[in-house]
Amino acid sequence: MRTGRPRSFCKDEALDKAIAVFWRQGYEGASMADLTRAMGINPPSLYACFGSKEGLFKAVLDRYDQRRNSFMESVVAAPTVAQVAETFLMGVAGFASDTSGRNPPGCLMLQGGLSCGDTTIPDVLARHRAEKEAILRTRFEQAKEAGELAGNADAAALARYLMVMSNGICVQAAAGATLEELREVAAIALTNWPANAGHKLHQDLTHSPA
Protein backbone atom coordinates (compact mmCIF):
# COMPACT_ATOMS: atom_id res chain seq x y z
CA MET A 1 0.00 0.00 0.00
CA ARG A 2 1.43 3.36 -1.04
CA THR A 3 1.75 6.09 1.50
CA GLY A 4 1.73 9.78 0.71
CA ARG A 5 4.92 11.73 0.35
CA PRO A 6 6.30 12.76 3.73
CA ARG A 7 5.58 16.34 4.71
CA SER A 8 8.58 18.49 3.86
CA PHE A 9 7.83 21.30 6.32
CA CYS A 10 7.28 21.73 10.04
CA LYS A 11 3.56 22.08 10.59
CA ASP A 12 3.83 24.10 13.80
CA GLU A 13 6.33 26.54 12.29
CA ALA A 14 4.13 26.97 9.23
CA LEU A 15 1.09 27.60 11.43
CA ASP A 16 2.98 30.18 13.48
CA LYS A 17 3.74 32.07 10.26
CA ALA A 18 0.12 31.77 9.13
CA ILE A 19 -1.02 33.16 12.48
CA ALA A 20 0.80 36.42 11.75
CA VAL A 21 -0.79 36.71 8.30
CA PHE A 22 -4.36 36.10 9.48
CA TRP A 23 -3.81 38.36 12.48
CA ARG A 24 -2.60 41.31 10.40
CA GLN A 25 -4.88 40.88 7.39
CA GLY A 26 -7.93 39.06 8.73
CA TYR A 27 -9.49 35.93 7.28
CA GLU A 28 -10.88 37.55 4.14
CA GLY A 29 -7.85 39.79 3.62
CA ALA A 30 -5.32 36.96 3.73
CA SER A 31 -4.88 35.55 0.23
CA MET A 32 -3.59 32.08 -0.50
CA ALA A 33 -0.54 33.70 -2.10
CA ASP A 34 0.12 35.65 1.10
CA LEU A 35 -0.25 32.52 3.20
CA THR A 36 1.89 30.19 1.11
CA ARG A 37 4.60 32.84 0.79
CA ALA A 38 4.73 33.42 4.54
CA MET A 39 4.56 29.71 5.35
CA GLY A 40 7.25 28.83 2.82
CA ILE A 41 5.18 26.14 1.14
CA ASN A 42 3.42 25.72 -2.19
CA PRO A 43 -0.37 25.62 -2.66
CA PRO A 44 -0.55 21.83 -3.20
CA SER A 45 1.23 21.27 0.13
CA LEU A 46 -1.15 23.64 1.89
CA TYR A 47 -4.23 21.94 0.48
CA ALA A 48 -2.82 18.47 1.16
CA CYS A 49 -2.18 19.31 4.81
CA PHE A 50 -5.13 21.57 5.66
CA GLY A 51 -7.71 20.94 2.94
CA SER A 52 -8.69 24.56 2.39
CA LYS A 53 -8.14 28.11 3.58
CA GLU A 54 -10.91 27.56 6.12
CA GLY A 55 -9.23 24.36 7.30
CA LEU A 56 -5.95 26.22 7.65
CA PHE A 57 -7.58 28.97 9.71
CA LYS A 58 -9.14 26.42 12.05
CA ALA A 59 -5.71 24.80 12.51
CA VAL A 60 -4.25 28.26 13.14
CA LEU A 61 -6.81 28.90 15.89
CA ASP A 62 -5.94 25.58 17.53
CA ARG A 63 -2.24 26.45 17.37
CA TYR A 64 -2.92 29.92 18.79
CA ASP A 65 -4.81 28.35 21.69
CA GLN A 66 -1.94 25.92 22.23
CA ARG A 67 0.49 28.82 22.54
CA ARG A 68 -1.77 30.40 25.17
CA ASN A 69 -2.31 27.24 27.24
CA SER A 70 0.43 28.05 29.75
CA PHE A 71 -1.13 31.48 30.27
CA MET A 72 -4.55 30.07 31.13
CA GLU A 73 -2.91 27.51 33.39
CA SER A 74 -1.18 30.31 35.31
CA VAL A 75 -4.48 32.20 35.53
CA VAL A 76 -6.47 29.39 37.13
CA ALA A 77 -3.52 28.45 39.36
CA ALA A 78 -3.65 31.85 41.09
CA PRO A 79 -4.44 31.29 44.79
CA THR A 80 -7.46 33.62 45.04
CA VAL A 81 -10.22 34.61 42.63
CA ALA A 82 -9.07 38.23 42.84
CA GLN A 83 -5.63 37.13 41.71
CA VAL A 84 -7.23 35.04 38.97
CA ALA A 85 -8.91 38.17 37.66
CA GLU A 86 -5.73 40.22 37.97
CA THR A 87 -3.51 37.63 36.31
CA PHE A 88 -5.98 37.28 33.46
CA LEU A 89 -6.60 40.96 32.68
CA MET A 90 -3.02 42.12 33.20
CA GLY A 91 -1.79 39.20 31.12
CA VAL A 92 -4.21 40.06 28.32
CA ALA A 93 -3.01 43.68 28.44
CA GLY A 94 0.54 42.38 28.11
CA PHE A 95 0.13 40.17 25.09
CA ALA A 96 -2.43 42.43 23.37
CA SER A 97 0.16 45.21 23.31
CA ASP A 98 3.11 42.92 22.56
CA THR A 99 6.10 45.22 22.21
CA SER A 100 8.46 42.44 21.11
CA GLY A 101 7.37 42.73 17.50
CA ARG A 102 6.53 39.03 17.33
CA ASN A 103 2.78 39.63 17.15
CA PRO A 104 0.52 42.43 15.92
CA PRO A 105 -1.38 44.31 18.63
CA GLY A 106 -4.77 42.96 19.68
CA CYS A 107 -6.00 39.39 19.48
CA LEU A 108 -6.16 36.91 16.62
CA MET A 109 -9.53 35.63 17.86
CA LEU A 110 -11.04 39.07 17.30
CA GLN A 111 -9.13 40.59 14.39
CA GLY A 112 -8.45 37.46 12.41
CA GLY A 113 -12.11 36.54 12.27
CA LEU A 114 -13.46 39.83 10.95
CA SER A 115 -15.44 39.56 7.69
CA CYS A 116 -15.40 35.78 7.45
CA GLY A 117 -18.22 35.66 4.92
CA ASP A 118 -20.27 32.52 4.47
CA THR A 119 -18.09 30.11 6.45
CA THR A 120 -18.22 28.20 9.70
CA ILE A 121 -15.43 30.40 11.09
CA PRO A 122 -17.69 32.61 13.27
CA ASP A 123 -19.01 29.49 15.01
CA VAL A 124 -15.48 28.18 15.49
CA LEU A 125 -14.35 31.49 16.97
CA ALA A 126 -17.34 31.52 19.31
CA ARG A 127 -16.45 28.01 20.46
CA HIS A 128 -12.86 29.00 21.22
CA ARG A 129 -14.01 32.02 23.23
CA ALA A 130 -16.57 29.89 25.06
CA GLU A 131 -13.84 27.44 26.04
CA LYS A 132 -11.82 30.23 27.68
CA GLU A 133 -14.92 31.46 29.49
CA ALA A 134 -15.68 27.92 30.67
CA ILE A 135 -12.18 27.60 32.16
CA LEU A 136 -12.74 30.75 34.20
CA ARG A 137 -16.26 29.71 35.20
CA THR A 138 -15.02 26.35 36.47
CA ARG A 139 -12.36 28.09 38.56
CA PHE A 140 -14.98 30.36 40.14
CA GLU A 141 -17.32 27.45 40.79
CA GLN A 142 -14.46 25.76 42.64
CA ALA A 143 -13.98 28.95 44.66
CA LYS A 144 -17.65 28.84 45.65
CA GLU A 145 -17.29 25.24 46.80
CA ALA A 146 -14.20 26.21 48.82
CA GLY A 147 -16.06 29.08 50.49
CA GLU A 148 -13.92 31.81 48.93
CA LEU A 149 -16.90 33.10 46.97
CA ALA A 150 -20.37 33.43 48.44
CA GLY A 151 -22.73 30.60 47.67
CA ASN A 152 -24.97 32.89 45.64
CA ALA A 153 -22.10 34.26 43.54
CA ASP A 154 -22.73 33.91 39.80
CA ALA A 155 -19.64 32.11 38.49
CA ALA A 156 -20.84 32.37 34.90
CA ALA A 157 -21.37 36.13 35.15
CA LEU A 158 -17.94 36.62 36.72
CA ALA A 159 -16.30 34.68 33.90
CA ARG A 160 -18.30 36.64 31.33
CA TYR A 161 -17.24 39.91 32.94
CA LEU A 162 -13.57 39.04 32.52
CA MET A 163 -14.09 37.97 28.91
CA VAL A 164 -15.92 41.19 28.05
CA MET A 165 -13.17 43.26 29.67
CA SER A 166 -10.43 41.29 27.91
CA ASN A 167 -12.13 41.70 24.53
CA GLY A 168 -12.31 45.45 25.08
CA ILE A 169 -8.63 45.56 26.03
CA CYS A 170 -7.73 43.73 22.82
CA VAL A 171 -9.83 46.05 20.66
CA GLN A 172 -8.17 49.08 22.25
CA ALA A 173 -4.73 47.55 21.73
CA ALA A 174 -5.46 47.04 18.04
CA ALA A 175 -6.54 50.68 17.86
CA GLY A 176 -3.17 51.81 19.18
CA ALA A 177 -3.52 51.94 22.98
CA THR A 178 -0.21 51.59 24.79
CA LEU A 179 0.65 48.94 27.34
CA GLU A 180 0.46 51.52 30.13
CA GLU A 181 -3.00 52.63 28.98
CA LEU A 182 -4.22 49.05 28.81
CA ARG A 183 -2.91 48.31 32.29
CA GLU A 184 -4.80 51.34 33.57
CA VAL A 185 -8.00 50.01 31.98
CA ALA A 186 -7.38 46.58 33.51
CA ALA A 187 -6.76 48.14 36.93
CA ILE A 188 -10.05 50.05 36.75
CA ALA A 189 -11.87 46.88 35.72
CA LEU A 190 -10.35 45.11 38.71
CA THR A 191 -11.63 47.76 41.12
CA ASN A 192 -15.13 46.64 40.13
CA TRP A 193 -14.31 42.99 40.75
CA PRO A 194 -16.86 41.87 43.37
CA ALA A 195 -14.53 39.51 45.16
CA ASN A 196 -11.51 41.77 45.62
CA ALA A 197 -12.43 44.18 48.42
CA GLY A 198 -9.15 45.38 49.86
CA HIS A 199 -7.17 43.50 47.23
CA LYS A 200 -3.97 45.21 46.13
CA LEU A 201 -2.45 44.56 42.73
CA HIS A 202 0.72 42.62 43.34
CA GLN A 203 1.56 40.92 40.04
CA ASP A 204 4.71 41.83 38.14
CA LEU A 205 3.07 43.95 35.47
CA THR A 206 5.95 43.38 33.08
CA HIS A 207 4.83 39.77 32.64
CA SER A 208 2.96 38.75 29.54
CA PRO A 209 2.33 35.30 28.04
CA ALA A 210 4.46 34.21 25.11
Model-derived features: positions:
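Amphipathic alpha-helical packing segments from all-alpha helical-bundle domains
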Residues: 119-146, 157
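Short helix-capping/turn signature of helix-turn-helix
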Residues: 50, 111-118
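An amphipathic alpha-helix signature
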Residues: 15, 86, 133, 137-141, ...
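N-terminal intrinsically disordered/low-complexity leader segments
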Residues: 1-9, 153, 199-210
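Amphipathic C-terminal alpha-helical segment
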Residues: 95-99, 114-115, 142, 162-180, ...
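Short, basic, alpha-helical segments at the C-terminal edge of helix-turn-helix-like DNA-binding modules
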Residues: 62-68
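Hydrophobic alpha-helical connector segments
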Residues: 59, 73-105, 155-162
